[in-house]
Amino acid sequence: MFYQDPFDVIIIGGGHAGTEAAMAAARMGQQTLLLTHNIDTLGQMSCNPTIGGIGKGHLVKEVDALGGLMAKAIDQAGIQFKILNASKGPAVRATRAQADRVLYRQAVRIALENQPNLMIFQQAVEDLIVENDRVVGAVTQMGLKFRAKAVVLTVGTFLDGKIHIGLDNYSGGRAGDPPSIPLSRRLRELPLRVSRLKTGTPPRIDARTIDFSVLAQQHGDNPMPVFSFMGNAFQHPQQVPCYITHTNEKTHDVIRNNLDRSPMYAGVIEGIGPRYCPSIEDKVMRFADRNQHQIFLEPEGLTSNEIYPNGISTSLPFDVQMQIVRSMQGMENAKIVRPGYAIEYDFFDPRDLKPTLESKFIHGLFFAGQINGTTGYEEAAAQGLLAGLNAARLSADKEGWAPARSQAYLGVLVDDLCTLGTKEPYRMFTSRAEYRLMLREDNADLRLTEMGRELGLVDDERWARFNEKLENIERERQRLKSTWVTPSAESADEVNAHLTTPLSREASGEDLLRRPEMTYAQLTSLAAFAPALEDEQAAEQVEIQVKYEGYIARQQDEIEKQLRNENTLLPATLDYRQVSGLSNEVIAKLNDHKPASIGQASRISGVTPAAISILLVWLKKQGMLRRSA
């Protein structure tokens, strides 16, 4: 039976990728359907109760700059906010927030249920309707069929999910939820490369059984950071501390003595786990010289007694988990309320996707989130937004859009996935970006909000706030450029008190701000350069733009040089055996990856600069040298 109304876009799955995809498509005016197996778990934090971190916070800010949901939700649900790398340069500073799971899920659901053009329907999806290599709809568990011009798969760890606790295992999408086995089998019938990955989660502890009096506290920052460019600290709920404990030799002995009961070490788990979030058994074995590992005890919410022990993800049996937990200081009498576990699941090779996250083989079918081999809420949300907006554009007969590596961490993420693929869960770091100084958290809106407006993602309120900020930055920079102080002026003594070397010539406000010892706050506290901007975001931009102007200009030059070849297009049907001069290895890799551009080709392992030169010459001779806009 077909549902009476067709849709423009169908989203399958209501996690962090699915909710952003649904919101993006609906914001762009397309009739959107979000199918989920359980409406009550929309926006569920399946693992750690945190948003942000190094690289990840950058993605959240970019999603927000494009009108997305995640930053707004965490501002309403964050119970501890910190700036990581606060003492380092602005390129690597990152916002991180501890979340109240219930408040976060509530904020997401309220946003979804109040979004025009979006319908939510509770039913698991078991099949796709594919006609002539084009997806045209989805079939639910009860046989109800929905038609649409585009479908976005955001199914997380649910595809043929298998949960492991010790040597026991059972089918599951995550603890308490069924897997999606029929859909997994259906997708395996399509011409797509599929493999298995693994992730894990720690046991949850009853806070009433922990002796916090012997543990060090870790508080959030004051003043409190804010995630959304539209947010403010008054939105944050009550703030609470986290606590720190450590593993010890007793902990490590328990783990080493029970490795034969670990599904990972016993060879029961085939999927590869996340390199940068290893299980505690992995850490103990890989870092055998370490006699302790730091564990953060993170509250899961203001109305919950559950504690998330960040750092002891494990799939060891329950009795061993109890021994591990009780071996640590403050946890001698602790009780576990949910056991830790590992989960294996299907993922599909992202090299089979276009940069828009549309399948190269099934027209109108998009993939986003863990199904593409990534790990983390933030990576999923960013992909969801991109897939959702491109599904909306496809349904409106418009060309797809994807940011370049030089524009956004989202561009880095998608390019890495679509060009290189991944054999392990992919996590974003600032080190993955070549142009970190340009891709900062603080300027995500300056980089992306104008494009978001053109795409139809940014509403009038955000657009007005953005333009006001731009005007404030420009006006303040002009004021500082045109305000001068001379060594003989009355105000010189006050200025010199803040300088390591006194004034020897006339200096503008911008000249003084370029000095490493002078901050914007100090400068505008001086009578000659007061008052400071009330707009804190604009004030931050003024300081960063002035202090790093030379470095930013140099990096912009690098980007422009790189873009000359980056955007040279490669035909999707090109057989690289036609290109004389390429080695057999290069031919095989290019035919396997099918890069969309010279830039993508240059990042494939084994494709040398010499091979790129040969390819450019051949394209020119064939009259095929074309660049994307």
Swiss-Prot record:
Entry GO terms, CC: cytosol
Description of how the protein assembles with itself and partners: Homodimer. Heterotetramer of two MnmE and two MnmG subunits.
Binding-site positions, FAD: G13, G14, G15, H16, A17, G18, V125, S180, Q370
Organism: Salmonella typhi
Cell compartment(s), UniProt: Cytoplasm
InterPro entries assigned to the protein according to its UniProt record, in alphabetical order: FAD/NAD-bd_sf (IPR036188), GIDA_C_N (IPR049312), MnmG (IPR004416), MnmG-rel (IPR002218), MnmG-rel_CS (IPR020595), MnmG_C (IPR026904), MnmG_C_subdom (IPR047001), MnmG_C_subdom_sf (IPR044920)
GO molecular function: flavin adenine dinucleotide binding
HAMAP family linked: MnmG_GidA
Protein known as: tRNA uridine 5-carboxymethylaminomethyl modification enzyme MnmG
